[in-house]
């Protein structure tokens, strides 16, 4: 049990065999030590009671019914401080049945086995740390190859070194077995050769981490001065450099956390509490069981057979021992991560078993479903829709959601301002949705940010703070620029709203988590608030020249611009264009001529050829280009300049200039 005041953080890492035993072992009043699961049995087929020393043993994990032992005897559960009570016959503790949710057991393996996460993951941590090929380490772990002269402290008899195939030495081992007793042969074999998890454990235990780091750094420095002759050598050098960097990182992690590398090889495996892998009686009779129970049983069956072969009176054939050790390794692999790096272990219905990795990983796993996916007070959830009128640091919060989330703050405000005499009166006013409630709610949320979160929260931009704005409806309004950080779009995505309660959390939300302070990607440093999807499509539609583009651009210029200058609508300001659109005299895609104020700033027409020049009786002339119409007097001075544009482009230009001016003034 984790106490909120006793522990400030939770660290996940490798556990030593001693630590695993410490989790499970308990000393009974008669001096017996319990905790080790020895039998592969679960429940007795007749009375459906847990088997002794099995996977559901009450002596190890606690009683099934509170205060009742395995014999059926009932006693009062002692209070805290009174001391523990045990049945003198079956030695089951009289306690609550909920202890079966956290009491663990362990299995003592007959041979060391390599942890499949560190052996077969990509990249392999064991192979990387030892500086060996993954193929060689896997062959060693699964007893296809042997390691000669595993320890350099003693003179050897067989004079063999490094890796060799087991079958090439099987005949010699068979002859030696005839001249030695079984115990003597085991001692000789341990000194001369090693294979399986035992060989990997010896290599890891003899590893000097600091020396490994120094050698890898020296090799990296040599590669930095290496001048490759061709691209193939350059790629090979780059791969070697990446491998050395990974090796330095892994060795440094082991040093910093004070974890020993040999703990990646298991000699003891923990057994989950029985209530986390239950067996349930169905109405029609059969038992429904967790896949973990079947996987634990496979490990126990194979491990028990191995112990019997090792402790037998007559020595077992060496090939049989090797085969049984390989079976134990495969069973433990399936228990930890079924199907990693090979075909999965299946049940009678040809369905792959769900291993420990499957139980804790993914959306339905223990972490995301049960630990991180809990319901939280002062939180809500709704569909997100686009809010283009919002600032980047604002979000639209539905009124009905806001009145529930901020209800404690509303009650506090009403009682302080003497608007309600007590809690009950304040709640009744809020439930009646009196007009004053909306006024108070607006005042409350002005100084109170909210947190928006979209699952899965894969990086820190998955949860950001916003200033809420009350809106009608039931959907949360979100600025489209912040969608990239959440990896969200407006096709039905849902987001959760959380209210920070403490002053510290509110301060952190305003200063650190507010969306306008999270404009860069934490991974690459590139801008993450870039227009995309709906924004780009909206800008394209707004600035589109004509919805029916059935002929080329040059043809359109000839047909519309220089022939119809006087027939097309012309305006002298942005305001006149907006006014005409409001009055529905023109639509969004209407082409028009707009008079520009800054005449001298326009120079792009100098690079174009005039399409048409018109003279009038006063001596002035009108020159029409592809995008401009310039009126000049007799001296050649510009009188006016008109730009060819559309209503949508005028709106875009006005909004862009307005936003830019506000930024400059700020």
UniProtKB/Swiss-Prot annotation:
Entries under InterPro entries matching the protein: DNA-dir_RpoC_beta_prime, RNA_pol_asu, RNA_pol_N, RNA_pol_Rpb1_1, RNA_pol_Rpb1_3, RNA_pol_Rpb1_3_sf, RNA_pol_Rpb1_clamp_domain, RNApol_RpoC1
Keywords for this protein: Chloroplast, DNA-directed RNA polymerase, Magnesium, Metal-binding, Nucleotidyltransferase, Plastid, Transcription, Transferase, Zinc
CC cofactor: Mg(2+); Zn(2+)
Assembly and oligomerization: In plastids the minimal PEP RNA polymerase catalytic core is composed of four subunits: alpha, beta, beta', and beta''. When a (nuclear-encoded) sigma factor is associated with the core the holoenzyme is formed, which can initiate transcription.
Gene that specifies this protein: rpoC1
Record-given protein name: DNA-directed RNA polymerase subunit beta'
Short name of any one Pfam family annotated for the protein: RNA_pol_Rpb1_2
Biological classification of the source: Eukaryota, Viridiplantae, Streptophyta, Charophyceae, Charales
Reactions performed catalytically: RNA(n) + a ribonucleoside 5'-triphosphate = RNA(n+1) + diphosphate
Class of the enzyme per the UniProt entry, highest EC level: transferase
Entry binding sites for Zn(2+): 69, 71, 87, 90
Family: Belongs to the RNA polymerase beta' chain family. RpoC1 subfamily.
GO CC, alphabetical: chloroplast; DNA-directed RNA polymerase complex; mitochondrion
EC number: 2.7.7.6
Gene Ontology MF: a single term: zinc ion binding
Cofactor binding annotation: Binds 1 Mg(2+) ion per subunit. Binds 1 Zn(2+) ion per subunit.
Residues engaged in binding Mg(2+): 489, 491, 493
Function statement: DNA-dependent RNA polymerase catalyzes the transcription of DNA into RNA using the four ribonucleoside triphosphates as substrates.
Location in the cell: Plastid, Chloroplast
Record organism: Chara vulgaris
Superkingdom of the source species: Eukaryota
GO BP, sorted A to Z: DNA-templated transcription
């Amino acid at each position: 049990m984790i106490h909120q005041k006793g522990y400030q953080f939770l660290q996940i890492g490798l556990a030593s065999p001693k630590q695993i035993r410490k989790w499970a072992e308990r000393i009974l009043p008669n001096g017996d030590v319990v905790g080790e699961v020895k039998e592969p049995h679960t429940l007795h087929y007749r009375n459906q009671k847990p088997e002794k020393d099995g996977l559901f043993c009450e002596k190890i994990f606690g009683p099934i019914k509170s205060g009742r032992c395995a014999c059926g005897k009932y006693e009062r559960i002692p209070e805290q401080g009174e001391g523990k009570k045990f049945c003198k016959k079956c030695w089951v503790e009289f306690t609550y049945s909920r202890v079966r949710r956290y009491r663990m057991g362990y299995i003592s393996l007959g041979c060391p086995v390599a942890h499949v996460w560190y052996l077969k993951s990509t990249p392999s941590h064991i192979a990387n740390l030892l500086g060996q090929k993954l193929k060689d380490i896997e062959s060693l772990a699964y007893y296809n190859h042997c390691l000669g002269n595993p320890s350099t402290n003693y003179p050897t008899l067989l004079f063999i070194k490094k890796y060799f195939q087991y079958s090439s030495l099987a005949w010699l081992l068979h002859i030696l077995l005839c001249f030695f007793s079984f115990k003597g042969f085991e001692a000789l074999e341990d000194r001369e050769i090693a294979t399986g998890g035992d060989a990997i454990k010896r290599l890891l235990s003899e590893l000097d981490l600091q020396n490994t780091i120094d050698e890898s750094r020296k090799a990296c420095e040599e590669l930095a001065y290496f001048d490759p002759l061709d691209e193939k050598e350059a790629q090979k050098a780059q791969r070697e450099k990446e491998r050395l960097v990974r090796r330095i990182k892994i060795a440094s992690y082991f040093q910093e956390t004070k974890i020993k590398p040999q703990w990646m090889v298991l000699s003891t495996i923990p057994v989950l509490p029985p209530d986390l892998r239950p067996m349930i009686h169905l109405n029609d009779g059969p038992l429904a069981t967790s896949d973990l129970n079947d996987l634990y049983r496979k490990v126990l069956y194979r491990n028990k057979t191995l112990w019997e072969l090792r402790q037998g009176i007559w020595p077992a054939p060496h090939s049989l021992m090797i085969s049984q050790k390989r079976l134990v390794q495969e069973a433990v692999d399936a228990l930890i991560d079924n199907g990693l790096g090979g075909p999965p272990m299946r049940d009678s219905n040809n369905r792959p078993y769900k291993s420990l990795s499957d139980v804790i990983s993914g959306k339905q796993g223990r972490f995301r479903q049960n630990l991180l996916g809990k319901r939280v007070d002062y939180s809500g959830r709704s569909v997100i829709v686009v809010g283009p009128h919002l600032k980047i640091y604002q979000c639209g919060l539905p009124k009905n959601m806001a009145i529930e989330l901020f209800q404690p703050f509303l009650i506090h405000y009403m009682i302080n301002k003497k608007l309600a005499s007590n809690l009950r009166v304040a709640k009744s006013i809020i439930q009646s949705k009196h007009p004053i409630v909306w006024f108070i709610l607006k005042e409350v949320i002005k100084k109170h940010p909210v947190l928006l979160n979209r699952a899965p929260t894969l990086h820190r931009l998955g949860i950001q703070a916003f200033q809420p704005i009350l809106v009608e409806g039931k959907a949360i309004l979100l600025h489209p620029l912040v969608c990239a950080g959440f990896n969200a779009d407006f096709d039905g995505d849902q987001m959760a709203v959380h209210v920070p309660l403490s002053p510290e959390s509110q301060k952190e939300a305003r200063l650190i988590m507010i969306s306008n302070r999270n404009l860069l990607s934490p991974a690459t440093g590139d801008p993450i608030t870039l227009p995309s999807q709906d924004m780009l499509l909206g800008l394209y539609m707004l600035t589109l020249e004509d919805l029916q583009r059935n002929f080329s651009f040059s043809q359109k210029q000839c047909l519309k611009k220089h022939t119809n200058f006087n027939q097309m609508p012309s305006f002298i300001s942005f305001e006149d264009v907006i006014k005409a659109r409001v009055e529905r005299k023109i639509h969004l895609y209407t082409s028009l001529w707009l008079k520009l104020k800054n005449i001298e700033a326009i120079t792009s027409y100098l690079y174009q050829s005039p399409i048409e020049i018109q003279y009038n009786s006063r001596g002035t002339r009108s020159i029409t280009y592809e995008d401009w119409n310039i009126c000049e007097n007799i001296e050649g001075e510009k009188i006016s300049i008109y730009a060819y544009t559309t209503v949508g482009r005028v709106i875009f230009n006005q909004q862009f200039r307005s936003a830019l001016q506000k930024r400059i003034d700020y």
